[in-house]
Design a protein with these regions (language model features):
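Bacterial N-terminal signal peptides
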Residues: 4-15
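Aromatic- and Gly/Pro-enriched helix-to-coil junctions and flexible linker segments
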Residues: 14-146
């Protein structure tokens, strides 16, 4: 019995003493205003040969975005917050290449994976939309181009 207790105490002490995998991952946080002003427009953007993100991610997918209100070109505050919560589930703050939001729609030869039924929206990590997503995942807080 003492051996079992000692074993579990050692395991618990080891888990508590472990450092985070990455200091950037632990220190980065996702900014709602940047999401609202820079990231959400990406979900509405039209790309040749692809459906807009909102077309498929409105229902039936792990990343579910709120439908646009009738006649509206963007989301209201409440729906933006719901989208923010949904998108956080597919992002590892501080680690873009471990964030499904960035790697699923990125071409495999550019560092993406084979998942994403909606096709590969970005052929390069240098794509401006991909760069905006990356900056947000890394903790971008500026909402303007300044």
């Amino acid at each position: 019995m003492y051996t079992t207790v000692f074993y579990w105490a050692l395991m618990l002490a080891g888990m508590l003493s472990q450092q985070p995998a990455s200091s950037s991952a632990s220190s980065a946080s996702l900014n709602f205003e940047v999401f609202r002003t820079k990231i959400q427009p990406i979900f509405l953007a039209r790309r040749p040969g692809h459906a807009r993100c909102i077309a498929c991610h409105g229902s039936g997918t792990p990343l579910r975005l709120q439908p646009l209100p009738p006649g509206s070109a963007t989301w209201n505050e409440e729906d933006s917050r719901k989208n923010f919560q949904a998108v956080q589930r597919v992002v590892l703050p501080g680690v873009p290449l471990k964030s499904r939001l960035l790697i699923h729609p990125l071409a495999e030869e550019a560092g993406g994976d084979f998942y994403h039924n909606g096709g590969k929206h970005w052929s390069s990590q240098n794509d401006p939309e991909w760069q905006a997503l990356k900056a947000w995942v890394l903790g971008e807080t500026r909402t303007s181009g300044d």
